[in-house]
Amino acid sequence: AIDEVAKFESVMETARKAIHDFINDEPNDLKIYEMEHPDVLLWAVWCIQQYAKMVSRDKCREKYGQLLEEIMEYLRRENHPNLFLHSNGLLYANGTEKAITWMNSTVNGHPVIPRTGYIVEINALWYNALCFVGELVGEAGNNNLAETLQTLAEQTGKSFIDTFLNEYGYLLDYVDGNMMDWSVRPNMIFTVAFDYSPLDARQKKGVLDVVTKELLTPKGLRSLSPKSGGYNPNYVGPQMQ
């Protein structure tokens, strides 16, 4: 709707300034809460991607093309305080000491679930962003950047499958070296939902089947499968429990 587009542009006008200043390490009175978290800039790209669907890719590129390029360059050059682009094309984030995703429950200042390393939804967002921005700049004739992003997307997509997809047909929640979290969690569903996914149709169906069977309830998705270790349907006692 027209009013939704206008509302988005109004909000993004504020966000754009805050993002620009964060990327360039400039002082800014416009603070976005938890801007430093690894997924915030990637969600900003996704939001602009939805805007492009509402208006047109040409208008989106005209209005936000420079911002998108700045974000991707910032991430590619590893200037983010807690996102590191590894040689396999995946983004690595450190979440051992501080909760860095939406699963941000803490006890005594430390995350209850220390999601760290290659985090599934962050790298799904990364792949989606590479493909979307790569296509967008290519349509504008910036072939060098388009080729760079598309080549990186191919590498990222292959590494994503090698790293996250397991023999049971679902995605690991996070991987840090030899530490692999096999918990069945809803974070993997983003890889099915995004416009650009490293998974093919068969792999998407496998993920969706697991999520549907183990996580879907009449109230929404569980944050953990009853079949996974650590699942507890009832919580009593102090915060630690």
Task: Tell what function each PLM region has.
Residues I2, I48, L68, L130-V133, ...:
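Hydrophobic core/packing positions within alpha-helical solenoid repeats
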Residues Y51-K63, L130-L149, R202:
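Inter-helical turn/loop segments and adjacent helix faces that build the functional surface
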Residues E70, L125-N128, T148-Q155:
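A non-catalytic, amphipathic alpha-helix used as a structural packing/dimerization or gating element
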Residues E4-F8, M54-R57, G138-E139, V184, ...:
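Alpha-helix C-terminal capping/termination sites
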Residues Q50, E70, Y74, L125, ...:
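Alpha-helical scaffold segments in soluble metabolic enzymes
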Residues S10-E34, R77-Y118, Q155-Q241:
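Extended glycan-interaction surfaces of carbohydrate-active proteins
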Residues A1-N94, I119-N123, Y127:
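Aromatic-rich carbohydrate-recognition surfaces in CAZymes
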Residues P38-D39, A44-W46, A153, F160, ...:
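N-terminal start-of-domain structural block
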